[in-house]
Amino acid sequence: MKIILRKEVSSLGLQGEVVTVKDGYARNFLIPNGLAIRATEGAIKAIETEKKQRAFKIEKERKAARELADSIERISLSVCVKAGESGKLFGTVTPQMIADGLKTKGFDVDRKQITIEEPIKALGKYEVSIKLYTDVVATLKLEVEGEAVEG
């Protein structure tokens, strides 16, 4: 019997694939458990349409992420942090600080998307990676400046 997989089945294939299995396996296990549907012409056309829509949506999201990455790479972000006279920071620069700084410039980036290779504990210029999509990573130029500390 030909079936269309609704979910990934390790021994058969990925979601949306049309595969041939024994009738009993399809009727008694795959179809009742919602893992597959019968491969009729209408179902195959519906799956193809769904695949095209999903591919279009993914490409649209990827394009938007690339545009956002280009915009982020064109700017430089300054973060003011309390620091001692030697230039060492009291604490570190966190992804949340960077996300808040980007938000003030009009970029909506979640702190979980920001990757800081090594903790930023001194004043200076750094580069920070921001993962905007599975294969789109922006590099942000970050300048850490010190605030005057009274003491």
Curated annotation (Swiss-Prot):
Gene: rplI
Pfam families attached to this UniProt entry: Ribosomal_L9_C, Ribosomal_L9_N
A GO cellular component entry from the record: ribosome
Family under the similarity heading: Belongs to the bacterial ribosomal protein bL9 family.
Protein's UniProt keywords contain Ribosomal protein: yes
GO molecular function, one term: rRNA binding
Entry function: Binds to the 23S rRNA.
Protein name: Large ribosomal subunit protein bL9
Gene Ontology biological process terms, A to Z: translation
Organism: Chloroherpeton thalassium (strain ATCC 35110 / GB-78)
TM annotation in the entry: none
Alphabetical UniProt keywords: Ribonucleoprotein, Ribosomal protein, RNA-binding, rRNA-binding
Keyword Transmembrane: no
HAMAP family in the cross-refs: Ribosomal_bL9
Coiled-coil regions listed: none
